[in-house]
Amino acid sequence: MAKLNAYFGEFGGQFVPQILVPALDQLEQAFIDAQQDDAFRAEFMSLLQEYAGRPTALTLTQNITKGTKTKLYLKREDLLHGGAHKTNQVLGQALLAKRMGKHEIIAETGAGQHGVATALACALLGLKCRVYMGAKDVERQSPNVFRMRLMGATVIPVHSGSATLKDACNEALRDWSASYETAHYLLGTAAGPHPFPTIVREFQRIIGEETKNQILAREGRLPDAVIACVGGGSNAIGMFADFIEEESVRLIGIEPAGKGIHTHQHGAPLKHGKTGIFFGMKAPLMQDEHGQVEESYSVSAGLDFPSVGPQHAYLNAIGRAEYESITDDEALDAFQALARNEGIIPALESSHALAHAIKMAYAEPDKEQLLVVNLSGRGDKDIFTVHKLLEDKGAL
């Protein structure tokens, strides 16, 4: 039986209760078979084009890098149906679930974007849907909670632990342990136990594939760097995957520095964590001095995650990708700058990547560079959060 690699260097693996191993084995085999099935690929591509709206645009910014020699393009995943990159891989996994004969879907969500994407895919494909969401995130993201419920999903608030994404992940896995015969766990990021990191990357890699074709058509060359925010890491690995072999292209992932790395209120385990076992995988993890999982923090719910996908850990370890961090305040500035200068309201998550690109442009204004930011989602879900933050700062 063909098998996928369970590890990226030392990272990854499958650290789950024995009861889930058959479900993960079944998923791996179904994915391998589906990837070799032309009819499955055609159905997936048809959904991406006719339902989700691919290909998404590659937009050259007009004003935000004025006074520099940087050309900054945005890969517009914010224009995808559902409002973020999440829709890509959710459609793939939902098709896979149907192929396996599962008729219920379990999901976890932080910002609510994965929950919304899962709910829309389930509505489209006739699957039952239940979404676990940290109670704090239910408060932070009420528009997305209502969207999920409108599309027929059951949203289950999780009050344990920090009542955020990591706790929702734990509850979703617990549910799946008891229901895997009829339910598929539709994991929302390129992390977790094998084979999820590989499956999610493959269903997201269309981001980088399109970007490569579009930038070559527009500029006649590859970009100097592609930049993406990193929480669990699915939008970033989707952007990076097709560029990993292109050694001239820098891969830059941006973790949330939150209120500052020195404050411990951040979500940057790649650069500031220790390797541990969490969420079914071996990966960098925010831990306290006793080795317990430390609470992560970010203004953006979708980056508020104490670990990171194993392929990012590997790309960091071998030096192929660079990982930097951006604070809440810097992300907030970039959020406003894009709205004011380009008429585009980005997700707070994506604003972290944008902030770093703007920094790169103005750090060397005379340097001719071609940058692409993965604008992973739109900011409608964040306008109330941003309004309150600006009000509190007296900046309105």
From Swiss-Prot:
Q: List the disulfide bonds.
A: none
Which pathway?
Amino-acid biosynthesis; L-tryptophan biosynthesis; L-tryptophan from chorismate: step 5/5
What EC number(s) does its UniProt record assign? 4.2.1.20
- Which Pfam families does this one have? PALP (PF00291)
- InterPro entries, per this entry? Trp_synth_b_CS (IPR006653), Trp_synth_beta (IPR006654), Trp_synth_beta/beta-like (IPR023026), TrpB-like_PALP (IPR001926), TrpB-like_PALP_sf (IPR036052)
The cofactor required is:
pyridoxal 5'-phosphate
Q: What class of enzyme is it?
A: lyase
SUPFAM superfamilies on file: Tryptophan synthase beta subunit-like PLP-dependent enzymes (SSF53686)
Top-level taxon of the source organism: Bacteria
Molecular function via GO: tryptophan synthase activity
| Gene Ontology, cellular component aspect | cytoplasm
User: Per its UniProt record, what PROSITE patterns does this chain match?
Assistant: TRP_SYNTHASE_BETA (PS00168)
Q: Sites of the modification N6-(pyridoxal phosphate)lysine?
A: 86
Gene Ontology BP, a term: L-tryptophan biosynthetic process
Q: Which UniProt keywords apply?
A: Amino-acid biosynthesis, Aromatic amino acid biosynthesis, Lyase, Pyridoxal phosphate, Tryptophan biosynthesis
The answer to whether keyword Transport applies is no
How does the record describe its quaternary structure? Tetramer of two alpha and two beta chains.
What is the documented function of this protein?
Answer: The beta subunit is responsible for the synthesis of L-tryptophan from indole and L-serine.
User: Mind telling me what this protein is named?
Assistant: Tryptophan synthase beta chain
Q: Which organism is it from?
A: Vibrio cholerae serotype O1 (strain ATCC 39315 / El Tor Inaba N16961)
Name the gene that codes for it. trpB
